């Protein structure tokens, strides 16, 4: 008897760790060194967590062997609550904070608790593909609104408005954005929130990169602009504190919660079903949020992340036929390949061919639900010398590549 996967997974896709990665693993098993520019995982590139975070986790291990409250440790949730108080988010209490095994788990939970079959959720294109996958897995229908490359990758408000229907339940905002690195202006956020207000939409705001900002970029917390809207804000320690493997994230729920008691009960139920988040990692949250913010040293002038962002952007734009909007936040660049210079009809084939030829692993743009096969994403985490080598190989590859 053949055992098949569930029909629920028929349209679920997460190509950041998709079929091309399997080819990369096979090449590694054959002895090839693969430079992985496919995922924002700081630790393998030499970005280490602050010592005091590691020390506090170790110190608390003897008392972290049992379950915690399903929402998480009181001390960690209070630290998150105070974090949003400092960001001028109104009405967030201890019971409005849920800790999770990374933001990823919480995204899935929030969609499972909200959506019925056929409900629509507005998701940016390009997006972090887990949002699209989580909507689909919950029985919903992701509707992608365009972000405008010619306007620094800001969301196209007219496109959002045109795609709202009676079935639309929620609006997803990813700011700072992955894969583009865009950091949205207050004016753009206010425009998006006004559309949510007019159509009674729940707002999901993914802010995992809120501390990774370059040049004069300023992050505005979405919920601080909309005390009258139900807003779920997602964040965690993975990126800013370089502990992606700890799987430590949270949701903060703000706005008129009295109108959403049934939905919140659904989130409570799902939180209870998975018992609790990783308890040792919960002990990192209070120290991380309350301690010295070492991420600032990495993004200010002479900081390693800023230098690598600059180098990535300069080198990509130096390749004939390639253009890239300067990322103002996060850990990625999302360059465009001019189809007049190098026509690509299948971008998954492009990244596989690049892997086989140059031993570089990047991600095709369509993996981020971008509708055209003319972009790819690279991480800006490697050291400058490795970036020089990697992007030089991409340039040489494109000189002769044809589909």
State what each model feature region is:
Residues 27-30, 138, 198-199, 229, ...:
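Helix C-cap/helix->beta junction micro-motif
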Residues 86, 161-162, 343-349, 353-362, ...:
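PLP-dependent enzyme catalytic core of the Aspartate aminotransferase-like
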Residues 143, 148-219:
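Active-site phosphate-binding strand-loop segment of PLP-dependent enzymes
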Residues 2-102, 109, 276, 288-291, ...:
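N-terminal small-domain helix-loop-helix segment of the aminotransferase-like
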Residues 286, 302-313, 324-338, 372:
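Conserved glycine-rich beta-strand-loop-beta hairpin in the small C-terminal domain of fold type I
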Residues 137-143:
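A short helix-loop-beta submotif of the ANL/AMP-binding
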Residues 113-135:
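Conserved PLP-anchoring active-site segment centered on the Schiff-base-forming lysine
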Residues 224-303, 313-314, 398:
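Conserved core segment of the aminotransferase class I/II
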């Amino acid at each position: 008897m053949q055992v098949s996967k569930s029909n629920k997974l028929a349209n679920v896709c997460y190509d950041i760790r998709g079929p091309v990665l399997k080819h990369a693993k096979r090449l590694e098993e054959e002895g090839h060194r693969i430079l992985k520019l496919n995922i924002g995982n700081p630790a393998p590139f030499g970005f280490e967590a602050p010592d005091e975070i590691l020390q506090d986790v170790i110190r608390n291990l003897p008392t972290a062997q049992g379950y915690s409250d399903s929402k998480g440790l009181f001390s960690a949730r209070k630290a998150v609550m105070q974090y949003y108080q400092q960001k001028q988010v109104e009405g967030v209490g201890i019971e409005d904070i849920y800790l999770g095994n990374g933001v990823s788990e919480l995204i899935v939970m929030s969609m499972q608790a909200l959506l019925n079959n056929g409900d629509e959720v507005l998701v940016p294109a390009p997006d972090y593909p887990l949002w699209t996958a989580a909507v689909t897995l919950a029985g919903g229908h992701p509707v992608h609104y365009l972000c405008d490359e010619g306007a620094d990758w800001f969301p196209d408000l007219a496109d959002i408005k045109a795609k709202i229907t009676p079935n639309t339940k929620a609006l997803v905002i990813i700011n700072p954005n992955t894969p583009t690195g865009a950091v949205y202006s207050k004016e753009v956020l206010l425009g998006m929130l006004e559309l949510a207000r007019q159509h009674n939409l729940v707002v999901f705001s993914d802010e995992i990169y809120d501390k990774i900002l370059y040049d004069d970029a300023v992050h505005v917390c979405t919920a601080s602009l909309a005390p009258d809207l139900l807003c779920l804000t997602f964040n965690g320690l993975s990126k800013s504190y370089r502990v992606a493997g700890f799987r430590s994230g949270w949701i903060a729920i703000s706005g008129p919660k009295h109108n959403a008691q049934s939905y919140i009960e659904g989130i409570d139920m799902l939180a209870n079903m998975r018992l609790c988040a990783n308890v040792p990692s919960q002990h990192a949250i209070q120290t991380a949020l309350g301690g010295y913010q070492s991420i600032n040293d990495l993004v200010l002038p002479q900081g390693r992340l800023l230098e690598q962002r600059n180098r990535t952007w300069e080198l990509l734009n130096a390749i004939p036929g390639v253009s890239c909007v300067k990322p103002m936040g996060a850990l990625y660049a999302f360059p465009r390949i001019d189809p007049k210079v190098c026509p690509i009809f299948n971008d998954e084939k492009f990244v596989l061919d690049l892997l086989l030829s140059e031993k570089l692993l990047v991600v095709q743009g369509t993996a981020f639900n971008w509708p055209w096969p003319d972009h790819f994403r690279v991480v800006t985490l490697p050291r400058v010398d490795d970036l020089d080598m990697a992007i030089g190989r991409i340039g040489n590859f494109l000189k002769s590549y044809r589909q």
